[in-house]
């Protein structure tokens, strides 16, 4: 009798081509996503070796990191960014890969366009030269980031040499209170386990609160698995998954969809399957959260205060948190609701989907962005932007004083014109608050879309459970 297996075990086993004497496995890769930053050297390696792309139809390319989110008719000003975009256009043409350029209405952030095109499906192995590839695990896929040399290996062979990770399960039961979202769940998880807590593991997210989430919410949680140190994050597929996937452009159709669904329904962890680590959270006890430091583990309730590093026993950790406070310009004991803001950024592969934008529009309709705040909303893709405009969301946001942009990674990272100026403080719906992440000496606070929207109007962080504008 076969031993009970986890969701991760099942997908891994289904994709092992061969196992080496050292225990490493040659893993078949179903889907490969590429963008302009981590792919140029990989394609050049193929040229030098005289190789072709093994399965061009299993790779999808898009520009996202370097594209400007303002007027695109002027082109890219930064020469290095322009070179990377031009290189990707040339590479996909030479190797026969489907490509969404900056003017394609399907263009967007790589981890948003994959799911919305139906390129991402349950049970697949999915890789990309980007750490937030874990996003696709929301569909019950094994998805993780890879390095540039591995990008070349996948292009050439459609395989990767991997070592199997350990299994970890995070169970979130209960019902989320009003004003608390998927972003708060994943920030709470990272706050609980730390940024190294998932190291060497693939996390399966389970429980009543996870099952109640939309696909957008599940993608938000899986997106930040890497911030918890995990190799990947996964949610078992269910009716919500199937409904999202069905009729997507690249999803199976008709009898092929029915056959695929029968397989997808087997993608659940068996009763009695063993996990190397288990974590449990009660969703009912979660408040809206805000990050205060320079690590995603530095989180606190909106009604909390900036912690005092002097209370930390470990000297190295204490010094690290003292450095974070100095960088952020905060003092121990300061109330989070007293922190004022210069900028608000709503977007990214964490929170740039239509559900996120609907939440923001609902929060700010009939209100105005605070005089001292510059706020921008960047849709995650051209299709998200078009849907938002069809619903009138853009009008609501622009009337409130938000800058409505073209799709791209934007201010999530300082690789394009959307950057913080030194010393500026930003409420951001993105996934990382490292030093300089959004621009040199910029200060980033991670929050949910609703929290960011309210902060834009109030000019400071507020408890959205009680906020009325």
UniProtKB/Swiss-Prot annotation:
- Top-level EC class as recorded in UniProt: lyase
Q: In which pathway does it act?
A: Amino-acid biosynthesis; L-leucine biosynthesis; L-leucine from 3-methyl-2-oxobutanoate: step 2/4
**Co-factor binding comment:** Binds 1 [4Fe-4S] cluster per subunit.
* EC assignment: 4.2.1.33
Record's catalysed reaction(s): (2R,3S)-3-isopropylmalate = (2S)-2-isopropylmalate
Q: Which PROSITE patterns does its entry note?
A: ACONITASE_1, ACONITASE_2
Where does the chain bind [4Fe-4S] cluster? 349, 409, 412
Q: Which NCBIfam families has this protein been placed in? A: leuC, PRK05478.1, PRK12466.1
Family of the protein in this entry: Belongs to the aconitase/IPM isomerase family. LeuC type 1 subfamily.
Would you tell me the protein name for this molecule? 3-isopropylmalate dehydratase large subunit
Species whose genome carries this gene: Methylorubrum populi (strain ATCC BAA-705 / NCIMB 13946 / BJ001)
